Amino acid sequence: MPSSSPDEVKILPAYTLAEAARYVGVSERTLRTWFRGGPAQSTIKGAFRRAAVKPILPTEAGPREPLSFLDLIEAHVLFSLRKSYKFPMAKVRVAMEYLATFGDDLTALAREDFFHDHGDIYLGRDRRLLSLTERGQMADKTILESGLHQITYGSDGYANEFYPLFNNAPQRDFVINPAVNYGYISIAKKGIGADALAARYQAGEKMSDIAQDCGLSLEDVVESIRWHDRLAA
């Protein structure tokens, strides 16, 4: 378990639901349900058709406040579990509810000691794994896979960098780091924001001039503009 709290920059408000949804690759409606829950639905005669949906992912953000970097990471991890491993949403809900019962840090999915197999969620504890979906059962680390190669972790034990997919393909050239470019997408090797490069191009500068001025390749500038256009869509 992390011995310290996450770095403050990781929990600051940073992303609207729409922005976070584009980074993660889900609809804004889906992300809103995960973090805010959903209202009950009723029939015309007033009978309940569906009860109110409780949030799955905890967040300190208020109803209209931006999400933090760690919120973004948790949404990415949840989406990855659902998409890649067909992980039942009910299992995630059980895990979050179990953590809440003993007041543990609720940013479980953004922590380095998070593990998963195809049917359970675990946290590292005392060199073993505590099953959150089996409510306290311990497991052997060797039977599990830790993953999510799009994330790197910091010395605080929490996610530090996020490399979002581009056109559903892994990439390591563009990164989201909460301490760089205000947490927005930037060129990994330089820390230059894709939005800044796109703004210069939109203002009429040639790509080749931008690349030379910033010490970048022409491809870096082209890809930055593509990232900007994709996230602005």
Outline where the language-model segments fall.
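Long, charge-rich, low-complexity intrinsically disordered regions
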Residues: 1-33, 39, 43, 48-52, ...
